[in-house]
């Protein structure tokens, strides 16, 4: 099973969960003790997993954002500042544009799910365990920013190395426990939804969001190369052809970091100065997560609409700006975007545990396309930085 890609395992989990949940209706055993016990066992696993995930979220935020902010601060130079500004700016713009498009399109496609599937829990867990997080999400964010900025201005790396070790521990928990168990977690979620008879509405919501997200990601790639063409005063849409290998590699790896060698070769083929490419491409693999931003903003809006909530501009504007900071500091690894942003989604948008499970499922299911959007956008940013660097050198 581990040899299968994460996307394949996730699809298997969704299908298995649906099949298990539908058995009650298909075979007329919905009210039997055996079927109810199976669903409640899955609900128990989902509950325990959610509790553990809630415990880990502040640690994920603290470790990744603290180290990310500190390391970015220590790299400060002219090219770094420009690259960081472009990455953050395009992330915020992608989030805001996605919000406006979502407000125009989603209400006509997604209706509140009857019976509020996102809150109901007809099949209670057999037992629950309460594990309180070490501190709250916003506390973790503020603490991470203070420590990160502070360590960036320290001469020594002693404290930074402590948090690097913490990051390694958290990364190990993510890669060896949380991410491998996500398919089982999602299977339990969909089994519960199917057993409650609300599968059709949920699948319709997922299909609508999935299609719109991918279209928006592709359009945003075009817009980034359009911006590069304007800034560089040269038609860089042709450069997209050279960037294609990075896009398709990322579809398979689901990791911006793992795609760096291919992305560098693409940058060289686009005649980007090697010094600029060697600096910008690896940096953007960590700080430029536009594809994740589009998914998280639109996915959150869709899930809120399905649960009867109203995603407002006043609610999403601060969320998008905070999400931009979080995405800049998030790791370029599978699931890094949603895991880093989950705290914001919970605290600023009011997501409940079932809603969190759905945004995790949606994000992981399209993570390949989101990552491909990220690495292709990196090429456009590299083109702009290269143009600015050449112009500055000529002066």
Enumerate the predicted regions with their spans.
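Signature of multi-pass transmembrane helix bundles
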Residues: 1-12, 16-26, 30-34, 38, ...
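Alpha-helical transmembrane segments of polytopic integral membrane proteins
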Residues: 17, 58-66, 94, 98, ...
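Short amphipathic alpha-helical coupling elements at transmembrane boundaries
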Residues: 40-51, 161-176, 242-249, 265-269, ...
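The feature identifies polytopic integral membrane transport proteins across all domains of life
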Residues: 45, 80-84, 113, 235-251, ...
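Hydrophobic transmembrane alpha-helical segments of multi-pass transport and channel proteins
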Residues: 52, 88, 92-96, 214-218, ...
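Juxtamembrane helix-boundary/capping and inter-helix hinge elements in multi-pass membrane proteins
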Residues: 69-78, 152-157, 165, 196, ...
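Helix-loop-helix junctions within the multi-pass membrane cores of secondary transporters/permeases
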Residues: 245-327, 381, 389-395
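Transmembrane alpha-helical segments and their short flanking loops
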Residues: 297-395
